């Protein structure tokens, strides 16, 4: 795929991914105001399995259609449920089966929104696509860089780190230069149906269901012991897949005899023994790591790592930038942090930045303890 040269908006056909939310609604409106030939596309990525419409797809489609009618553009629909199942959901299940905590939104962006949707839009004759993500792009000669969104509270570059520069070059991000209150104000000013709609949270295909109830439909639970760091068995877990590093709620071990009143946290998942290791206190030493190992690194554009490089990183969404040194290893990459990192979680993504430029990232394989463990 060759990167397009941005041309006269009046001669540029843009198809906007319309989610039924306020961000994509305002994105379409702004592009119209900038003079682009704009159309919308609503994509359905999950087939409801029991008629209860957990994903609210019907409501979202109605909202997207109402917005398109209001601003006077055509709305296409496309079903990418098969692609989502094959390229996102099956990987999601495999990761949980392996005892890790994946982030399906990152794969969804790479495989669905910036691949299946992009390819489909181009087949419809689009020159570019647009989304409501809070990120920006910068064209630098032959490359297109991915930049953080200007609103630090909404920046979504963490979720787009696995999208290639060529795909970014085919995409416009109209709200990336705005803050969320500005976006809602624009929507209200123009009477858009989504102006006051709540932002979607959580994973689409789970919706309002309890996560454990959803997961056990696909993966058999394997109960096991809950142990302290000293090896004392203090309870039972229903399955390691239901727990993540740093988790406090839902352990069912409060009020133990001779224990302090401090809350319990998940410190480690011993996959070999199917044991959940817990400890008390938000500052428990086992919660902190000095470094991590990462694999499946995906760079937005080529990155030279012939020698260790000083960068910043995020090990979770909305985390502040953390200074680190990134180096190649025989099996992947190692990031050593200047400060202790709390609850570094295998299966989640680490994303690297050089200033406001999102360079890319990868999957956390393991965390190195900040202090030695007995």
From Swiss-Prot:
Catalytic residues of the enzyme: 108, 204
GO cellular component: cytoplasm
Encoding gene per record: mnmA
Disulfide bonds: 108-204
Region (Interaction with tRNA): 154-156, 316-317
Segments of this protein annotated with the region Interaction with target base in tRNA: 103-105
Gene3D superfamilies: Adenine nucleotide alpha hydrolases-like domains, HUPs, Translation factors
InterPro entries for this protein: MnmA-like, MnmA-like_C, MnmA-like_central, MnmA-like_central_sf, Rossmann-like_a/b/a_fold
GO molecular function: ATP binding; tRNA binding; tRNA-uridine 2-sulfurtransferase activity
Marked site (Interaction with tRNA) residue numbers: 133, 348
One BP term from GO: tRNA wobble position uridine thiolation
Annotated compartments: Cytoplasm
EC number, UniProt record: 2.8.1.13
Organism expressing this protein natively: Pseudomonas putida (strain ATCC 700007 / DSM 6899 / JCM 31910 / BCRC 17059 / LMG 24140 / F1)
The name this protein goes by in its record: tRNA-specific 2-thiouridylase MnmA
Catalytic activity, reaction form: S-sulfanyl-L-cysteinyl-[protein] + uridine(34) in tRNA + AH2 + ATP = 2-thiouridine(34) in tRNA + L-cysteinyl-[protein] + A + AMP + diphosphate + H(+)
Binding site for ATP: 17-24, 43, 132
Family: Belongs to the MnmA/TRMU family.
Function: Catalyzes the 2-thiolation of uridine at the wobble position (U34) of tRNA, leading to the formation of s(2)U34.
């Amino acid at each position: 795929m060759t990167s397009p040269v941005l041309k006269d908006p009046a001669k540029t056909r843009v198809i906007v991914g319309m989610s039924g939310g306020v961000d994509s609604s305002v994105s379409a409106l702004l592009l119209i105001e900038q003079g682009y030939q704009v159309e919308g596309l609503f994509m359905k990525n999950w087939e409801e399995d029991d008629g209860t419409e957990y994903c609210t797809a019907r409501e979202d489609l109605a909202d997207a259609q109402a917005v398109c009618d209001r601003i006077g553009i055509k709305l296409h629909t496309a079903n990418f449920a098969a692609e989502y199942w094959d390229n996102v959901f099956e990987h999601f299940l495999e990761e949980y089966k392996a005892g890790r905590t994946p982030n399906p939104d990152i794969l969804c962006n790479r495989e669905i929104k910036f691949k299946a949707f992009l390819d489909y839009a181009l087949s419809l004759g689009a020159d570019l696509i647009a989304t409501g993500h809070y990120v920006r792009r910068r064209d630098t000669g032959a490359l297109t860089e991915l930049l953080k969104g200007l609103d630090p509270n909404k920046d979504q570059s963490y979720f787009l780190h696995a999208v290639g520069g060529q795909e970014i070059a085919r995409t416009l991000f109209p709200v990336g230069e705005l803050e969320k209150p500005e976006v809602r104000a624009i929507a209200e000013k123009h009477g858009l149906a989504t102006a006051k709609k709540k932002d979607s949270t959580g994973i689409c295909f789970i919706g309002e269901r309890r996560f454990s109830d959803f997961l056990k439909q696909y993966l058999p639970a394997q109960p096991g012991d809950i142990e302290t760091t000293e090896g004392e068995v203090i309870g039972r877990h229903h399955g390691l897949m239901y727990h993540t590093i740093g988790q406090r709620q839902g352990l069912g071990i409060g009020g133990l005899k001779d224990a302090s009143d401090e809350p319990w946290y998940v410190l480690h998942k011993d996959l070999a023994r199917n044991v959940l290791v817990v400890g008390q206190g938000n500052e428990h030493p086992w919660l902190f790591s000095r470094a991590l190992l990462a694999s499946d690194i995906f760079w937005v554009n080529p990155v030279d790592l012939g020698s260790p490089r000083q960068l910043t990183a995020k090990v979770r969404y909305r985390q502040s930038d953390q200074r680190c040194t990134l180096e190649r290893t025989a099996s992947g990459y190692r990031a050593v942090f200047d400060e202790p990192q709390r609850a570094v979680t295998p299966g989640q993504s680490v994303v690297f930045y050089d200033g406001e430029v999102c360079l890319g990232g990868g999957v956390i394989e393991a965390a190195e303890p900040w202090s030695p463990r007995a």
